[in-house]
Design a protein with these regions (language model features):
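Hydrophobic side chains in beta-strands
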Residues: 48, 71, 95, 128, ...
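Short glycine/acidic-rich loop motifs that flank beta-strands on beta-rich extracellular proteins
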Residues: 6-12, 43, 65-71, 89-95, ...
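Extracellular polysaccharide-degrading/modifying enzymes targeting complex plant/algal/animal polysaccharides
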Residues: 1-60, 101-112
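Structured core elements
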Residues: 68-70, 150, 165, 199-201, ...
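Extracellular beta-rich repeat passengers
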Residues: 3-6, 10, 213, 224-293
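Short, solvent-exposed turn/loop segments enriched in Gly/Ser/Thr/Pro and often Arg
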Residues: 72-75, 96-99, 139-147, 168-170, ...
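Right-handed parallel beta-helix
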Residues: 1-3, 52-63, 75-90, 102-132, ...
Length: 293
């Protein structure tokens, strides 16, 4: 566990409790996988579990050592809107399952009781700045295994690693995640300290999920990362499947589709996307006042 001596993270600050090598290596989804890991969930300033119809409206969370706000499990029909996250030590806004509780991280998560799934969440018109200032592997806005969740019109400016991350488990097999939407977000100044990242990043099978009309601007690449070229505006990683990625603006077509599963559709992404789409990304007019705080 984390201590004064530090900790070993798997990804996004989720720390390894136990791990071992696979002999022979490989799983049905990932033939070359040679390790397994069991993880713990980092703390947050505010956590929510087993709740429905919860709203965070115009709240401010800042100067944290770990994460900001975390919808941990069994949270449904809830919203975070018009909130300000600033100077966050780890992940700014977190939601969903990340294969904890003794479940191995690389296996598809399908709970017997679907009431435990975080579902029908809306994260809209939030401003997230200077995230992952203490644990550099953090993400400004990260949703693990969630269902029918909308991440829209948020603005992210400054994060050590990834802007928005959706999915978990590194598997193309069916899991509980589906029907999610990442739409019209504005992301700039990501990857300030860590590479192998994307402005928007996905993992695993997510039937019916759409990534659309986002604007991802240039990162700020640290001069001392191990591979300063290993970053992308859009990054569908291990097992990403059944996801539609369309009409996203970026300065160039720098995208990565790494070990994806079937059924992904990429349509009209890059600098040729309409300037109207680029201009509409980020905070809507009623929430522009957040930029002045």
């Amino acid at each position: 566990r984390p201590s004064i001596s530090g900790h070993v993270p798997l990804q996004a600050g989720f720390f390894i409790l136990d791990a071992y090598g696979l002999k022979p290596k490989g799983t049905p989804d990932w033939r070359s996988l040679d390790n397994q890991a069991w993880i713990g969930r980092p703390p947050a300033a505010v956590t929510v579990s087993g709740a429905q119809h919860v709203s965070f409206d115009r709240c401010r969370i800042e100067h944290t050592a770990a994460s900001g706000l975390d919808f941990v499990d069994a949270v449904q029909d809830s919203t975070v809107e018009g909130c300000r996250f600033n100077d966050i030590g780890l992940n700014g806004l977190v939601a969903g399952e990340f294969a904890g509780g003794g479940f191995e991280s690389h296996l598809p998560w399908n709970p017997a009781d679907e009431r435990t799934i975080c579902a029908r969440l809306k994260f809209t018109n939030n401003l997230l700045t200077d995230c992952a200032t203490e644990d550099w592997g953090g993400v400004a806005l990260i949703a693990g295994i969630v269902r029918d969740t909308t991440i829209a019109h948020n603005e992210i400016d400054g994060t050590s690693y990834t802007g928005i991350s959706l999915g978990w488990s590194w598997t193309r097999s069916a899991n509980a995640s589906r029907g999610n939407l990442i739409h019209a977000n504005l992301i700039r100044n990501f990857a300030t300290r860590v590479s192998d990242t994307g402005g928007i990043y996905t993992l695993s099978a997510q039937p019916g999920t759409v990534v659309s009309e986002n604007a991802v601007l240039h990162p700020i690449i640290s001069p001392y990362v191990h591979d300063p070229e290993h970053w992308y505006y859009l990054y569908t990683d291990e097992g990403s499947s059944l996801i539609t990625v369309r009409d996203n603006w970026s300065p160039e077509k720098r995208f990565l589709q790494n070990a994806n599963g079937p059924g992904n559709q990429w349509e009209n992404n890059g600098p040729q996307v309409s300037e109207k789409i680029k201009a509409a990304a980020g905070l809507e007019p009623a929430f522009q006042d957040l930029l002045k705080q």
